[in-house]
C-alpha cells in the first residue's frame, strides 16, 4: 500500500512538472487573446512599428531581436499581456 501511494505521488510530481511550465499569451496585437502552455518557462512581448502602425507579438521563450524592436521577457503566468 505504501509503495502504491509513493508511486502515485511521484507520478503526480512528474506530470505537474512544478516550475518548468508557464502560461503565456501568444497572439499578435490584431487578434483576440489566446494562451499557450510553454515549456521554456518564459514569456515575451515584442513591439515594433511599421507601415501598419504599432505591432505587438506575444509568445513563449525570450527570442533575440533585431535593432528597433523592443522586447520584454517575464517569468510568471500571463505576464506578457
Swiss-Prot record:
Keywords: Acetylcholine receptor inhibiting toxin, Disulfide bond, Neurotoxin, Postsynaptic neurotoxin, Secreted, Signal, Toxin
Endpoints of the signal sequence: 1-21
Disulfide linkage: 24-43, 38-60, 62-73, 74-79
The UniProt record lists the keyword Lipoprotein: no
MF terms in GO: acetylcholine receptor inhibitor activity; toxin activity
Domain of life: Eukaryota
Disulfide bond as UniProt keyword: yes
Record localization: Secreted
Tissue: Expressed by the venom gland.
GO terms under cellular component: extracellular region
Function as written in the Swiss-Prot or TrEMBL entry: Binds and inhibits fetal (alpha-1-beta-1-gamma-delta/CHRNA1-CHRNB1-CHRNG-CHRND, IC(50)=1.4 nM), adult (alpha-1-beta-1-delta-epsilon/CHRNA1-CHRNB1-CHRND-CHRNE, IC(50)=12 nM) and neuronal alpha-7/CHRNA7 (IC(50)=400 nM) nicotinic acetylcholine receptors (nAChR) thereby impairing neuromuscular and neuronal transmissions.
Protein family per UniProt: Belongs to the three-finger toxin family. Short-chain subfamily. Type I alpha-neurotoxin sub-subfamily.
Protein name as it appears in the record: Three-finger toxin A1
Protein source organism: Micrurus laticollaris (Balsas coral snake)
Amino acid at each position: 500500500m505504501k509503495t502504491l501511494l509513493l508511486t502515485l505521488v511521484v507520478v503526480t510530481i512528474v506530470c505537474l512538472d512544478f516550475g518548468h511550465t508557464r502560461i503565456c499569451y501568444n497572439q499578435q496585437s490584431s487578434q483576440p487573446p489566446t494562451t499557450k502552455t510553454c515549456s521554456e518557462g518564459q514569456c515575451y512581448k515584442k513591439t515594433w512599428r511599421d507601415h501598419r502602425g504599432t505591432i505587438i507579438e506575444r509568445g513563449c521563450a525570450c527570442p533575440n531581436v533585431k535593432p528597433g524592436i523592443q522586447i520584454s521577457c517575464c517569468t510568471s503566468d500571463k505576464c506578457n499581456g
